[in-house]
């Protein structure tokens, strides 16, 4: 009974991963926007432009780091940047599992248990997926993502993901602007994809890493992403 149930779960994961591998970068960015508190305050065409710029930003800064340090190895880069890496088993925040965290100025925490569990799940899938999602590769992808957030801090005055802002309110000549969290995430994904020479969008790890903890939530992410990708999910834009 346990073996049969396990096989059913594994097959389901494989189907989701294969579908998600076909999703374009723009759709992943729109999915990320759909979870952003500022989502409805930005026009659809503006989001598309922002996503493209954030992707270009992430890739450009990855190439800059590669040129400066002469390597794509994220562990070596982290060492050269004087980052302190801490590896934990797992960390819960409310009902959610935290996979990694950058704490300024120099600390990156990565949770090893979710990565191990994800890699073990993939082992039961077809060889093409096994090769894409090795444990070491997943770990390097996550590390690259967090390194980008450090890079953002270092170049906050010029990096697109920090300089692009949205006007929150304008009262009696006083204006309040906010950065857009989604752009930081899109940039980080593009950065680690470029550093690690990934053939897949790193956003897909949101599904893979969650799956061993909460398959229902992972499936919801999967369906939401496909909904955005197909154009079925449209949200109104607020007037402000």
Predicted regions and their residues:
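Residue-level recognition of short, structured coil/turn motifs
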Residues: 70, 156-160, 197
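Long, positively charged binding patches that form subdomain-scale interaction surfaces
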Residues: 126-142
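Metalloprotease/metallohydrolase-associated module, dominated by Zn2+-dependent proteases
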Residues: 163-240
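Active-site recognition of the HExxH zinc-binding catalytic motif
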Residues: 141-158
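A metal-dependent hydrolase signature that marks the N-terminal structural subdomain at the beginning
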Residues: 1-121, 127-128, 132
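Conserved binding/catalytic microenvironments
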Residues: 103-119, 134, 156-159, 165-166, ...
